[in-house]
A protein has these predicted regions:
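A short, structured loop/turn motif at beta-sheet edges
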Residues: 170-175
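Hydrophobic-face positions in mid-chain alpha helices that act as interaction patches
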Residues: 2, 46-159, 178-180, 185-223
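All-alpha RGS (Regulator of G-protein Signaling) helical domain and cognate RGS-like helical scaffolds
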Residues: 1-2, 27-33, 55
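Flexible helix-coil transition and linker loops at the boundaries of alpha-helical arrays
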Residues: 6-27
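Structural signature of alpha-solenoid helical repeat junctions
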Residues: 23-26, 30, 147, 154
Length: 223
């Protein structure tokens, strides 16, 4: 079905369409999104060569991301996380409950023992962005803010597919190059919104192979 959709879109023309909630009638962005979706499916199926090929034609910059863009911070039009917190289910959604935080938040938390930061990586800003205040919708300034867009298909996913698929098919160096391209995007602020885009709280310097050998900053235990 995706291949047929890509073929049909290839024969169409782009035109401004207000009813297209994602790409305003831009066929090239739709085609790229379809390729990213194909890459996602093939990666899950462990078809790494095909996944890499599809990702090569997928979303190539964050300007091509497929996002759900809330119309306003009002019920029925807002960020879906915010909708849950603002309704009768406040307290049911969050990543810090009863003194326990989610693994994602632990990985991003500079004060936690599971933190994955190092001399080349500072995740403080993303930790703030992805933290959810489960007690109040209005208390959220990041991923669960009422007007915060929500990703569906993105450059970041596409780039990380390229990183994994490249490493599995062409070797570590190829995968690392694609990973560093993703990190370079993070260094621009990535998906951080204005509340969390503070350059003093993030850093994503490029890795080198030595960082991953035994004793390197990403392999201190030599596994």
């Amino acid at each position: 079905l995706l291949a047929e959709a890509i073929e049909d879109l290839g024969q169409a023309s782009s035109r401004n369409e207000s009813f297209d909630l994602y790409f305003n009638g831009d066929k090239d962005k739709w085609i790229a999104a379809a390729y990213t979706l194909k890459a996602r499916i093939n990666l899950v199926m462990k078809n790494y060569s095909t996944a890499l090929s599809e990702a090569g034609m997928g979303i190539s910059s964050s300007s091509g991301d497929m996002m759900y863009n809330p119309r306003s911070a009002q019920n029925g039009q807002a960020n879906l996380f915010w909708e849950i917190l603002n309704g009768s289910r406040s307290g049911d959604l969050g990543n810090a409950k009863q003194g326990q935080t989610s693994y994602l938040i632990d990985l991003l938390d500079p004060s936690h023992s599971d933190y994955r930061g190092n001399a080349k990586t500072n995740e403080e800003a993303r930790h703030g962005y992805y933290s959810i205040d489960e007690t109040s919708a209005s208390g959220n300034t990041g991923v669960a803010m009422g007007t915060e867009p929500q990703p569906m298909l993105t450059f970041s996913e596409n780039q990380l597919i390229k990183a994994e698929a490249s490493a599995r098919t062409a070797g570590f160096s190829s995968g690392l190059s694609e990973l560093n391209a993703y990190r370079a995007w993070l260094q621009t602020g990535g998906r951080l919104n204005a509340n969390h885009n503070n350059a003093t709280k993030f850093k994503y310097d490029a890795y080198v192979e030595a960082d991953f050998v035994g004793g390197g900053m990403e392999n201190s235990d030599g596994l």
